[in-house]
A protein has these predicted regions:
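Pyridoxal 5′-phosphate
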Residues: 1-183
Length: 183
Protein backbone atom coordinates (compact mmCIF):
# COMPACT_ATOMS: atom_id res chain seq x y z
CA UNK A 1 0.00 0.00 0.00
CA UNK A 2 2.21 2.71 -1.31
CA UNK A 3 4.85 3.12 -3.99
CA UNK A 4 7.98 1.03 -4.12
CA UNK A 5 11.37 2.52 -3.38
CA UNK A 6 10.77 4.22 -0.07
CA UNK A 7 11.43 2.85 3.36
CA UNK A 8 12.88 3.59 6.73
CA UNK A 9 15.84 2.46 8.77
CA UNK A 10 16.06 2.71 12.54
CA UNK A 11 19.66 2.98 13.70
CA UNK A 12 21.10 3.27 17.19
CA UNK A 13 23.53 6.08 18.02
CA UNK A 14 26.54 3.73 18.15
CA UNK A 15 26.02 2.35 14.64
CA UNK A 16 28.74 3.32 12.20
CA UNK A 17 27.02 3.18 8.84
CA UNK A 18 28.86 4.31 5.74
CA UNK A 19 26.88 6.22 3.10
CA UNK A 20 25.89 4.26 0.01
CA UNK A 21 26.38 7.37 -2.11
CA UNK A 22 27.15 10.99 -1.44
CA UNK A 23 26.05 14.24 -2.97
CA UNK A 24 24.21 17.44 -2.26
CA UNK A 25 22.17 17.58 0.90
CA UNK A 26 20.03 20.53 -0.09
CA UNK A 27 21.03 22.16 3.21
CA UNK A 28 24.83 22.05 3.30
CA UNK A 29 25.47 22.29 -0.43
CA UNK A 30 29.09 23.48 -0.24
CA UNK A 31 30.36 20.50 1.72
CA UNK A 32 32.52 18.16 -0.35
CA UNK A 33 31.55 15.18 1.81
CA UNK A 34 28.34 14.15 3.47
CA UNK A 35 27.88 15.57 6.99
CA UNK A 36 28.58 13.13 9.82
CA UNK A 37 25.19 13.60 11.54
CA UNK A 38 22.42 11.09 10.99
CA UNK A 39 20.16 11.00 9.09
CA UNK A 40 21.70 13.66 6.79
CA UNK A 41 24.82 11.52 6.30
CA UNK A 42 22.70 8.89 4.53
CA UNK A 43 20.45 11.25 2.54
CA UNK A 44 22.37 12.21 -0.59
CA UNK A 45 20.53 14.09 -3.29
CA UNK A 46 16.87 14.95 -3.48
CA UNK A 47 14.59 12.96 -1.22
CA UNK A 48 11.85 10.89 -2.86
CA UNK A 49 9.02 13.31 -2.00
CA UNK A 50 6.30 11.50 -3.97
CA UNK A 51 7.42 8.18 -2.48
CA UNK A 52 7.37 9.59 1.04
CA UNK A 53 3.88 11.06 0.49
CA UNK A 54 2.71 7.74 -0.94
CA UNK A 55 4.20 5.85 1.99
CA UNK A 56 2.37 8.15 4.41
CA UNK A 57 -0.90 7.61 2.54
CA UNK A 58 -0.33 3.85 2.60
CA UNK A 59 0.32 3.85 6.35
CA UNK A 60 -2.79 5.95 6.95
CA UNK A 61 -4.84 3.49 4.87
CA UNK A 62 -3.43 0.55 6.86
CA UNK A 63 -4.34 2.28 10.12
CA UNK A 64 -7.85 3.06 8.86
CA UNK A 65 -8.62 -0.47 7.65
CA UNK A 66 -6.62 -2.39 10.26
CA UNK A 67 -4.06 -5.11 9.64
CA UNK A 68 -6.36 -7.82 11.01
CA UNK A 69 -9.10 -6.83 8.56
CA UNK A 70 -6.66 -6.77 5.66
CA UNK A 71 -5.26 -10.18 6.57
CA UNK A 72 -8.74 -11.67 7.06
CA UNK A 73 -9.94 -10.55 3.64
CA UNK A 74 -6.76 -11.61 1.82
CA UNK A 75 -6.89 -15.00 3.56
CA UNK A 76 -10.56 -15.41 2.65
CA UNK A 77 -9.81 -14.64 -1.01
CA UNK A 78 -6.87 -17.05 -1.03
CA UNK A 79 -8.96 -19.83 0.50
CA UNK A 80 -11.78 -19.22 -2.01
CA UNK A 81 -9.29 -19.39 -4.88
CA UNK A 82 -7.72 -22.58 -3.53
CA UNK A 83 -11.14 -24.16 -3.12
CA UNK A 84 -11.97 -23.46 -6.76
CA UNK A 85 -8.70 -24.53 -8.38
CA UNK A 86 -7.70 -27.61 -6.37
CA UNK A 87 -9.91 -29.92 -8.44
CA UNK A 88 -8.86 -28.62 -11.88
CA UNK A 89 -7.27 -31.52 -13.78
CA UNK A 90 -3.55 -30.98 -14.29
CA UNK A 91 -3.23 -28.14 -11.81
CA UNK A 92 -0.45 -28.36 -9.26
CA UNK A 93 -0.53 -26.09 -6.22
CA UNK A 94 2.81 -25.58 -4.48
CA UNK A 95 3.04 -25.37 -0.71
CA UNK A 96 1.32 -27.17 2.12
CA UNK A 97 -1.69 -25.02 2.87
CA UNK A 98 -3.10 -27.63 5.23
CA UNK A 99 -0.21 -27.10 7.64
CA UNK A 100 -0.60 -23.46 8.56
CA UNK A 101 1.43 -22.15 11.50
CA UNK A 102 -0.17 -22.20 14.95
CA UNK A 103 -1.26 -18.60 14.52
CA UNK A 104 -2.97 -19.48 11.22
CA UNK A 105 -1.05 -16.78 9.37
CA UNK A 106 -0.15 -17.41 5.76
CA UNK A 107 0.59 -14.81 3.12
CA UNK A 108 -2.05 -14.56 0.40
CA UNK A 109 0.15 -15.94 -2.38
CA UNK A 110 -0.59 -19.10 -4.35
CA UNK A 111 1.86 -20.57 -6.86
CA UNK A 112 0.64 -23.07 -9.44
CA UNK A 113 1.47 -24.87 -12.66
CA UNK A 114 -0.76 -26.52 -15.22
CA UNK A 115 0.70 -29.92 -16.13
CA UNK A 116 3.92 -29.33 -18.06
CA UNK A 117 2.97 -25.94 -19.54
CA UNK A 118 5.67 -23.30 -19.25
CA UNK A 119 4.77 -20.83 -16.50
CA UNK A 120 5.52 -17.85 -18.77
CA UNK A 121 3.07 -19.19 -21.35
CA UNK A 122 0.33 -19.60 -18.74
CA UNK A 123 1.00 -16.13 -17.33
CA UNK A 124 0.94 -14.61 -20.83
CA UNK A 125 -2.39 -16.28 -21.62
CA UNK A 126 -3.83 -15.06 -18.32
CA UNK A 127 -2.81 -11.48 -19.11
CA UNK A 128 -3.48 -11.33 -22.84
CA UNK A 129 -6.72 -13.29 -23.00
CA UNK A 130 -8.22 -12.71 -19.56
CA UNK A 131 -6.65 -9.48 -18.29
CA UNK A 132 -5.31 -11.22 -15.17
CA UNK A 133 -1.89 -10.11 -13.93
CA UNK A 134 0.31 -12.81 -12.43
CA UNK A 135 4.04 -13.33 -12.10
CA UNK A 136 5.77 -16.26 -13.76
CA UNK A 137 9.26 -17.65 -13.40
CA UNK A 138 11.65 -18.44 -10.59
CA UNK A 139 10.72 -15.51 -8.30
CA UNK A 140 14.31 -15.11 -7.06
CA UNK A 141 13.96 -18.44 -5.24
CA UNK A 142 16.18 -20.96 -7.07
CA UNK A 143 16.48 -23.32 -4.10
CA UNK A 144 12.70 -23.57 -3.78
CA UNK A 145 12.43 -24.39 -7.47
CA UNK A 146 15.17 -26.98 -7.14
CA UNK A 147 13.20 -28.55 -4.27
CA UNK A 148 9.99 -28.69 -6.34
CA UNK A 149 11.80 -29.62 -9.57
CA UNK A 150 10.48 -26.57 -11.39
CA UNK A 151 13.79 -24.96 -12.40
CA UNK A 152 12.87 -25.11 -16.10
CA UNK A 153 9.11 -24.61 -15.83
CA UNK A 154 8.96 -21.98 -13.12
CA UNK A 155 5.62 -21.27 -11.43
CA UNK A 156 2.68 -18.93 -11.93
CA UNK A 157 2.21 -16.79 -8.82
CA UNK A 158 -1.12 -15.26 -7.82
CA UNK A 159 -0.89 -12.56 -5.14
CA UNK A 160 -4.12 -11.47 -3.50
CA UNK A 161 -4.77 -8.01 -2.15
CA UNK A 162 -7.33 -6.44 0.13
CA UNK A 163 -8.61 -4.66 -2.96
CA UNK A 164 -9.29 -7.82 -4.97
CA UNK A 165 -12.88 -9.03 -5.18
CA UNK A 166 -14.56 -12.43 -5.05
CA UNK A 167 -15.60 -11.89 -8.68
CA UNK A 168 -11.94 -11.51 -9.65
CA UNK A 169 -11.09 -14.71 -7.78
CA UNK A 170 -13.85 -16.54 -9.64
CA UNK A 171 -12.62 -15.15 -12.98
CA UNK A 172 -9.05 -16.25 -12.25
CA UNK A 173 -10.17 -19.76 -11.30
CA UNK A 174 -12.35 -20.00 -14.41
CA UNK A 175 -9.45 -18.82 -16.58
CA UNK A 176 -7.18 -21.53 -15.14
CA UNK A 177 -9.89 -24.11 -15.79
CA UNK A 178 -10.16 -23.02 -19.43
CA UNK A 179 -6.38 -22.95 -19.92
CA UNK A 180 -6.05 -26.41 -18.38
CA UNK A 181 -8.72 -27.63 -20.81
CA UNK A 182 -6.72 -26.28 -23.79
CA UNK A 183 -3.63 -28.36 -23.24
Amino acid sequence: MGPQGTGGLYVGERADIKPFKSGGTGVLSFLENQPMELPTRLEAGTLNGPGIAGLLTGVMELEKIGLDNIYAKEHELMQAFMGKIKTIPGIRIYGDFDMLPDNGLHCAIVSVNIADMDSAEVSDILMNEYGIATRSGIHCAPLMHKFFGTQNQGMVRFSFSYYNTVDEINEAAEALMQIAGMR
